[in-house]
Amino acid sequence: MKLTTVTNVSVDGVTQGHRRIDAGPRHETDAPDEDGSGTFERFGWAPPLLDDAASTFISQTFQRADAFLFGRRTYEIFAGSWGAGMDPGNPVGEALNTRPKYVASTTLTDPRWADTTVLSGDVAGAIGELRAKPGGELQVWGSGTLIRWLLDRRLVDEIVLLTYPVVVGQGTRLFPATGPDLGLDLVDLLSTPKGLTIQTYRTTGRPQYEAATA
């Protein structure tokens, strides 16, 4: 399966707190799990900028997934929002409740959401086995710490960025100040009436650099 990450990000690269629901209790922070809120205060910067075009893209992206991969904190947020009792006619809820879900976590032992498998121990090996399966798409939503962990191990095939026209000015960013370098090919670019840009990139290994002059 192709491993695709889908991330809501501000112009200054912040991923943290894009919805108010993210202002929950702090959970484990050890990679490959998701980070907590810390001292971040500027929650909910994304919903005012969502429009019908962005919502349609999000729904269609969820529907094309064959399976989902989460860090623990994002998994628990999604389970609380989209788990039992969700309107079966909701396309996002339908996708999440009918596809297999995988959680990269060293502490989660009793997942309550149906069709969930916890990946512990050799997480990279388990994800590699999922990627080796023919066809399909394994999607990672949110889960910023997990995404950085995956990028560091070059386990990501495509990166989708929903970039919101806002500078948040604080918070955890998708790409750290120091991390792996990565070449990208732009395979799709969309814009919405409220100014979101949605970029889809295919990873190409390490980037090329200008040769040093004599």
How would you label these PLM feature ranges?
Residues 160:
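Conserved catalytic/dimer-interface elements of ABC ATPase nucleotide-binding domains
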